[in-house]
C-alpha cells in the first residue's frame, strides 16, 4: 500500500493547524490514502487542546510579550509550547487496515513507528505504561508533564506528546518530538507559573532528541529515520507528494478560522 508524505517545513501556528485540518477533511471526503506530515513552527507558539480554556491555563500576557502565537487544535489533550521540535500528524480514513478502530490501539501503532524511527538514530525508547504521572506534582495544563499510556519515553522521561481526534470517517493524530527543551520558556507561558520546584520536576521528566545523543542531528536526518520507522512498522510504501489544489484552497480558508479570537477562546 502507498501512503503520502509531506516533508518537514516550518509555518506559523494558524497555517499549521489549517493544513492538518484540510488534509483530514479532504481525506475523509474523498477517501484518500493516509498522510504523514512533519513540520515546525515559526514563530514559536502554544497550541491548546480542543477543550482547554486559554484564560485559565495560559499566561496570555507573557505570550503577547514574547511574541508567541496561541492556536487551538482540533485534537484534545493539553497545552504544548512549540519551539525547537518536529511535529508530526497522521491522517487516515476509517477502515485503514494499519490501525485498530480505537484511540489507544491507534496511539500504540503510531508510537511503535516513532520508537522504531528513534532506534534508527541510536535512541532507545519505550512506551509508557498506564497510569504513569509525575509524583507529587500537578502540571495539568502542560502536555509534557504527564506521560499517558503508549506515549514515548527515553530513560523514563517523556520525549513525545500526542493527541488524537476521531470521527466516523477517520482520525487525525498530532504529536511533538522535542529536539531541545527549555522548561523555563515552557512554564513561563503555560500555567502554573515557573517555580524552582516546577522547573526541577519538569526538567527531570522531559527528554529531547539532541540532549540524549552524543552530538546534535540534522532535522532532515531525523525526519528520514522517522519516515523509515513508519514504513517498516506499517509495511507500506511512503511517497513524498505535495498538498492537492483542493487542500490548498481549503487550507487558505481555514487559516481565517484559526486566527479568529472566537475559535481561540471557545470551549
Identify what each model region corresponds to.
Residues 41-43, 65, 81-85, 147, ...:
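Short connector loops at helix/strand junctions that flank enzyme active sites
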Amino acid at each position: 500500500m502507498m501512503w503520502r508524505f509531506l516533508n518537514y517545513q516550518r509555518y506559523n501556528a494558524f497555517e499549521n493547524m489549517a493544513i492538518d485540518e484540510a488534509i483530514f477533511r479532504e481525506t475523509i471526503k474523498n477517501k484518500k490514502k493516509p498522510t504523514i506530515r512533519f513540520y515546525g513552527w515559526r514563530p514559536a507558539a502554544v497550541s491548546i487542546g480542543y477543550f482547554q480554556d486559554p484564560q485559565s491555563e495560559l499566561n496570555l500576557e507573557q505570550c503577547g510579550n514574547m511574541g508567541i502565537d496561541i492556536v487551538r487544535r482540533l485534537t484534545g489533550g493539553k497545552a504544548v509550547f512549540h519551539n525547537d521540535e518536529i511535529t508530526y500528524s497522521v491522517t487516515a480514513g476509517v477502515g485503514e487496515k494499519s490501525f485498530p478502530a480505537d484511540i489507544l490501539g491507534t496511539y500504540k501503532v503510531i508510537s511503535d513507528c516513532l520508537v522504531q524511527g528513534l532506534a534508527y538514530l541510536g535512541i532507545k525508547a519505550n512506551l509508557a505504561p498506564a497510569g504513569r504521572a509525575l509524583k507529587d506534582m500537578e502540571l495539568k495544563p502542560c502536555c509534557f508533564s504527564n506521560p499517558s499510556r503508549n506515549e514515548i519515553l527515553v530513560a523514563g522521561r517523556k520525549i513525545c506528546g500526542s493527541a488524537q481526534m476521531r470521527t466516523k470517517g477517520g482520525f487525525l493524530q498530532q504529536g511533538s518530538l522535542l529536539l531541545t527543551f527549555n522548561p523555563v520558556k515552557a512554564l513561563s507561558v503555560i500555567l502554573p507559573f515557573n517555580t524552582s520546584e516546577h522547573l526541577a520536576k519538569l526538567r527531570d521528566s522531559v527528554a529531547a532528541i539532541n540532549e540524549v545523543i552524543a552530538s546534535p542531528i540534522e532535522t532532515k536526518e531525523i525526519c528520514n529515520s522517522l519516515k523509515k520507522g513508519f514504513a517498516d512498522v506499517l509495511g507500506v510504501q511512503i511517497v513524498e507528494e505535495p498538498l492537492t489544489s483542493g487542500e490548498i484552497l481549503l487550507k487558505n480558508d481555514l487559516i481565517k478560522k484559526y486566527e479568529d479570537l472566537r475559535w481561540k477562546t471557545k470551549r
